[in-house]
Amino acid sequence: NKIFTNCGTLGMLEEYGCAFEKTGRGSVKVSIRINPGEGAGHSKKTNTGGPYSKHGIWYENLSEARNIAKRHGLIISGVHTHIGSGGDMDHLKRIAGKLVDFAKQFSDLEVVNFGGGLPYQYDPNLPQDDISRYKSILNERVGILEQYFGRKIVCEIEPGRRFVAGCGYLVGEVRALNHTFEEDGKRLDYVLGNIGFCHLIRPMAYGSFHPIWIVGDDLGPDQNIIIAGPV
């Protein structure tokens, strides 16, 4: 097959190159994912760039990536980065600039993928992040590359989460109530539902915010409660 493979480590690039030489199958053109040395996200747990992220070839090792590709007869025609989920426009702009600088090191460049990470605000009481600048940021960066190489460069982004993050609801049922007391006598009330982190892991894994609405008749007065799952 001629699948355009994106290699995220030097080892992956080496493995692909060995298989390509041995079998003669696959695409001679490949892409590499670059770790630009920094990341951004709404928390450290959604940060996929920088020294504490496993993702991507470290930006100082790009010459080694070129050597591996040359040794196996591969052409690095694409570069890619993705720094995390929920970064702001200033971070995305800076990383896009870095990727342009990295891309100039690959003379056969055809495709540059700026990744995703466009922020989405789950809290209905807060304004949605403005991403109107993003198009102009990318147009400017791609224009720099096209001027540098003297040809058209394909620009790719991964905006999917921004568009679908608010498109669904997880519906559950209250199955039990419980309460405990702290040492000072303060009462803690729990609502136990039939849905939990096995259905929506994001709050537990990332500390992410998701609004909760309790629907029903005769809910009683407002009070502080702790929402818990069945496990």
Residue locations for each model-derived region?
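Short glycine/threonine-rich loop-to-helix capping motif typified by GTGT followed
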Residues: 88-95, 122-133, 164-176
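Flexible glycine/acidic-rich beta-alpha junction loops that bind and position SAM and/or redox cofactors
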Residues: 39-40, 110-126, 156-167, 199-200
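Charged (often Lys/Glu-rich) extended helix/loop segments that serve as interaction or gating elements
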Residues: 137, 143, 152-231
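Generic beta-structure capping elements
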Residues: 33-37, 117, 196, 230
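Active-site-proximal beta-alpha core segment in soluble small-molecule metabolic enzymes
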Residues: 1-111, 120, 133, 141, ...
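Glycine-rich anion-binding loop/nest that anchors nucleotide
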Residues: 80, 115, 229-231
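Nucleotide-activated donor-binding/catalytic signature segment of Leloir-type glycosyltransferases, i.e.
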Residues: 149
